[in-house]
Amino acid sequence: MVVIKDIVAREILDSRGNPTIEVDVSTEGGVFRAAVPSGASTGIYEALELRDKDPKRYLGKGVLNAVEIVRQEIKPALLGKDPCDQKGIDMLMVEQLDGTKNEWGYSKSKLGANAILGVSIACCRAGAASKGLPLYKYIATLAGKTIDKMVMPVPFFNVINGGEHAGNGLALQEFLIAPVGAPNIREAIRYGSETYHHLKNVIKNKYGLDATNVGDEGGFAPNVATAEEALNLLVEAIKAAGYEGKIKIAFDAAASEFYKQDEKKYDLDYKCKTKNASKHLTGEKLKEVYEGWLKKYPIISVEDPFDQDDFASFSAFTKDVGEKTQVIGDDILVTNILRIEKALKDKACNCLLLKVNQIGSVTEAIEACLLAQKSGWGVQVSHRSGETEDSFIADLVVGLRCGQIKSGSPCRSERLCKYNQLMRIEESLGADCVYAGESFRHPK
């Protein structure tokens, strides 16, 4: 039996220049590495990300405490363990070594989700190597999925950034393009890349060259003030690229970031110094705005249209548009089984955004995915705005047969490493895979 011989942790930098944790797990089969991402617009119900809070280092964002936790607490408990026992390893860390809980389950507030996840992903890679399987096939076996005919996901490219990801006036955080009409993942990525470059030219011609600077996820951040302006840019770019009908549009409102708790309203003007009362909308009024966009633009997916606790608005919106439009829960669900169960009961959305670092272990992420899929939801695997060169989520989305992934724009290496890995996987599978395409919500 292959066993864990050593675990090493270190502090590295993510794509925003902030510290994050990297973990190496060593077995007789080699050294297996994982780096943990970090979000900017984080849901309040996410598992705890442990930061040092030492103002003398990295403005308090260091992760040396998490590194020491791996070295001093996790490593001694896992030495000699079988890396193929993914659930056993994860639950040892989550339930026994940490054990902290809140109303939504294990909170990881002792060890930190970042420390636990780094070890969890590295062990997953070690387990795959021990079994002699590609990582995506090993993940499929962990989830009880078939490995006969794999599904390649539709990539959702974030090409215009707003919200907390950019310095413009846009309240909504992401505007995305999805090549559902492509024949395979390689062509889908080509469609996305070409449209991205056409979008750059459209923006340059309208707003000047300096408007083509990019945000945290590689999308452009032009100084547009309204969502309609951003959506019109996408329509123009898709047409210029020649992919009308083949590329659809999605957006992530990340509405928790502009929800005003004291007013019980959504402030679409929250990034502007001059306040406009007409931009402060109730959930009902904002729902009407969204529904107007759905009628006007080829939008197939909407993420976090309302605040993470506004289940009523989520439910009303999903009831009205959910048959034709994907309604994704991110901050409202945070990849948490108990939050998903509440949303299922309330019929609040119809798709889970799967972020492994929100919940903090591979096992819990797989369980969340399986619950969503069993309940008839879609599942979209997602990166974070603070990313690394780790391409784990590319293997995860294929292994779990989710049919859709978002990993930023076709720009910046920490985004492209996921898309490039998907092309490699498709190449290795050959005829043994299909592209999700129009069936991305419920891939066959």
Curated annotation (Swiss-Prot):
Q: What class of enzyme is it?
A: lyase
**Extra notes?**
While ENO1 and ENO2 display similar K(m) values, the pure tachyzoite-specific enzyme (ENO2) has a threefold specific activity at V(max) compared with that of the bradyzoite-specific enolase (ENO1).
Q: Which residues form the active site?
A: 217 (proton donor), 355 (proton acceptor)
Q: Please list the cofactors this protein needs.
A: Mg(2+)
Q: Subcellular location, in the record's words?
A: Cytoplasm
Q: What is this protein called?
A: Enolase 1
Q: Native species of this protein?
A: Toxoplasma gondii
Tell me the superkingdom of the source: Eukaryota
Please describe the quaternary structure of this protein: Homodimer.
Q: What is the lineage of its organism?
A: Eukaryota, Sar, Alveolata, Apicomplexa, Conoidasida
